[in-house]
Amino acid sequence: MDALLTSPFIPLKKPSHNRKSNTTTASSSSSSFLQLIPQTKKETLDFDLPRYNTLISPTLDLAVVGGGPAGLAVAKRVSDAGLSVCSIDPYPNLVWPNNYGVWVDEFAAMDLLDCIDASWNSASVFIDDNNRKLLSRPYARVDRRRLKSRLLNAYLSNGVRFHQSKVLNVVHEEAKSVLLCSDGTRIPAAVVLDATGFSRCLVQYQQPYNPGYQVAYGILAEVEEHPFELDQMVFMDWRDSHLGFRPELKKRNDGLPTFLYAMPFSSDLIFLEETSLVARPGLLIEDIQERMIERLRHLGIRIKRIEEDERCVIPMGGPLPVLPQRVLGIGGTAGMVHPSTGYMVARTLAAAPIVADAIVGYIGGSGAEVSARVWKDLWPIERRRQREFFCFGMDVLLKLDLEGTRRFFDAFFGLEERYWHGFLSSRLFLPELVGFGFSLFGRASAGCRLEIMAKGTVPLIKMIRNLLKDLE
């Protein structure tokens, strides 16, 4: 508790949002708020980015495919070391569309507190109508404009080049790889990094890819009012009293539950997201929207304007990419999504220096040698073992209905903070995770223990088998 309370805290401030919209500003009942969804607005940053010269094309040290946070962070650090870098993306000036939430201590550890635009000194978890847990761990929303602007400013100082196109394929030679772009451009580079996220543009997978899916629908909305405290965000709300008069919807939610995640910025501005934690196959967005409509109606939230809406489909778990391979990966394309939670932003930003420093340190050898060394640094055995445990957690969660999920999180958030903090932030490794598992089992109710034993035995055997196989 003491460690948490001394974490850096950014006082809550109302972020700047553009209130101009083509949509109606009339209040909407929850049942019709989807009518207020604005047309997709693509916000761009005003940077004059230096372009890659297609006429003079010496082999680059690094070509980064994709312009998300992790890819830009790697490119920035590699260019800091004086290496030549090109970032290839169809929309290099575009502001990232999704709202990213992080624990404040995660961004503090990376000296990124200036890239937060709102924060809350605590978070709440509603297990059910009679059980609410208060998490004394500051939480924040990432300032997408500021984070990308910070990285692009460094790019300009370091001489990074940009090419606005989509990469279609890559051809490997012994000492370099050549990227083939949709506009016909060929870009040679000693090292290629695929940072395209879940599209997995270039990174190869051999095993059958059958992940779980986290599916969510969210809105940034101006509302008449909402019932949430302004100094707390809602991390999870598993209550289902809003479905009392919708028996068919309640039955679906009993089997495949969803929860509400909410970030209140002011008394009339809030981000609301209905989320399926993990399911296989993933839930339909329309199903999630229907549940969200009923929840907002029950909470008395009337939407006046929707400023943004987002639809997230996040693959979780599944096999790692082929290790090693010539194309490097980071983030979603490298299997770095937390298989039990869907978290990725802080983890991948923290991994960016590892990948970048490995590239800088190993470049100069053959393409295959460099790639093999970098992949080894990104996925050392302790990280692979950690991921196997997280996949075990995901496999258990896949089998839980609403009541089982409630019992699980009642025990989870009742653990010592070092355990649930470390689990959510990928800071626990296998010996600590074993301790986490025993502690969770000991904390759980009798019903939860029986369920873990009944539904976790097969996933546990699978995890042990994979851990032993990784030693071969």
Curated annotation (Swiss-Prot):
Which terms does the UniProt entry file under GO BP? carotenoid biosynthetic process
Q: Give the EC number(s) under which this enzyme is classified.
A: 5.5.1.19
- Gene3D superfamilies from the UniProt entry: FAD/NAD(P)-binding domain
Tell me a GO cellular component: chloroplast
Region labeled Disordered — which residues? 1-27
Q: Transit peptide range?
A: 1-25
Tissue/organ expression: Expressed in flower buds and lips. Detected in roots and leaves.
Q: Which residues bind NAD(+)?
A: 62-90
Kindly give the NCBIfam families that the UniProt entry links to this protein: carotene-cycl
Provide the function of this protein.
Answer: Catalyzes the double cyclization reaction which converts lycopene to beta-carotene and neurosporene to beta-zeacarotene.
User: What is the protein name given in its UniProt record?
Assistant: Lycopene beta cyclase, chloroplastic
State the species of origin.
Oncidium hybrid cultivar (Orchid)
Identify the taxonomic lineage of the organism of origin.
Answer: Eukaryota, Viridiplantae, Streptophyta, Embryophyta, Tracheophyta
